UniProtKB/Swiss-Prot annotation:
Broad class of enzyme this protein falls into: oxidoreductase
Protein name in the entry: FMN-dependent NADPH-azoreductase
Family annotation (PANTHER family): CHROMATE REDUCTASE (PTHR30543), NAD(P)H-DEPENDENT FMN REDUCTASE LOT6 (PTHR30543:SF21)
Lineage: Bacteria, Bacillati, Bacillota, Bacilli, Bacillales
Keywords linked to the UniProt accession: Flavoprotein, FMN, NADP, Oxidoreductase
Function summary: Catalyzes the reductive cleavage of azo bond in aromatic azo compounds to the corresponding amines. Requires NADPH, but not NADH, as an electron donor for its activity.
EC number annotated for this UniProt entry: 1.7.-.-
Assembly with partners or alone: Homotetramer.
Family, as annotated: Belongs to the azoreductase type 2 family.
One function term, GO molecular function aspect: oxidoreductase activity
CC cofactor: FMN
Amino acid sequence: MKGLIIIGSAQVGSHTNALSKYLKGQLGEHDVEVEIFDLAEKPIHQLDFAGTTQAVDEIKNNVKSLQSKAMEADFLILGTPNYHGSFSGILKNALDHLNMDHFKMKPVGLICNSGGIVSSEPLSHLRVIVRSLLGIAVPTQIATHDSDYAKLEDGTLYLEDNEFQLRAKLFVDQIVSFVTNSPYEHLK
């Protein structure tokens, strides 16, 4: 079983990235192969977090890589920071390079992090997009806050909150169950 986590944050080492790494570890306990596609590290938009323009060839290669990995994946997880009550433009740009063939009847997990007011609104917006792309958004979603994380001595963030660790377990179990017991395989 293969999964792809797409991180729509412009910041390297983001809270969304920390949550994605935590989920990758949890999925690994189910012998699931997971790749994280962090758009801060592999940009497909024109400007990076520092405001510099990426080389056109680099963008094209990143788009091809994203499309290939999404096609190979049995499930996807979309991760975003909460940007003004919605998901990031960077994630929207990435999704614009994918189509129904990448999502059709695949389980899709939704995660986000808020620095300010905790909100699941970005996930509600993504849920509509997943449905439009014929994906199946799993019922459990994760919306964290910066305060749910702690830092290691080197500054690396990690999910510290026990409640969200339990929610992450349910989230992972649902994704694995949807892939393993898919009643929609014949519709792909």
